[in-house]
Regions:
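Terminal alpha-helical segments
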Residues: 1-135
Length: 135
């Protein structure tokens, strides 16, 4: 499912649907992180999993070989979660309602997609190496 969301994000980028890129990229990262959390029998129905990721995954010694990558993964998870609502719903900012359609541009969307791909690649590798899950 996380991979499907990455594909959707890539297609949205090609179609200049930048808020959709952000939405699908965030969703992909959340899903792959929750897959790893599920392997530890820990699941919470929230969108910002960065703190849970830290407590459950990063503090577990069996994942110590991934510490450097996990620092970036956690940073990206938090950053992507910040955009969860903003990529989906209008938000009042400075007395003005800002639509997701007006919030993001091509460069921002491409950067978001790269961050989501990093999260996906790292966590898929961990799922494969630690838990013998390949997709």
């Amino acid at each position: 499912m996380a991979h499907h969301d990455l594909i959707q994000a890539e297609e949205a980028l090609a179609e200049s649907k930048y808020s959709d890129v952000v939405m699908y990229a965030q969703q992909s990262s959340e899903k792959i992180a929750k897959a790893l959390l599920e392997m530890e029998r820990h699941f919470e129905n929230i969108h910002d999993v960065s703190d849970i990721f830290y407590v459950v995954i990063m503090k577990d010694k069996k994942y110590s070989a991934y510490e450097n990558d996990f620092q970036m993964v956690r940073k990206y998870l938090r950053w992507l979660a910040f955009h969860w609502g903003k990529s989906r719903y209008p938000v009042l900012e400075g007395g003005v309602v800002v639509s997701p359609l007006d919030r993001y541009d091509k460069n921002f969307a491409a950067d978001v997609l790269e961050k989501a791909k990093f999260v996906y690649d790292v966590l898929l590798k961990v799922l494969g190496e630690v838990h013998d899950i390949s997709s």
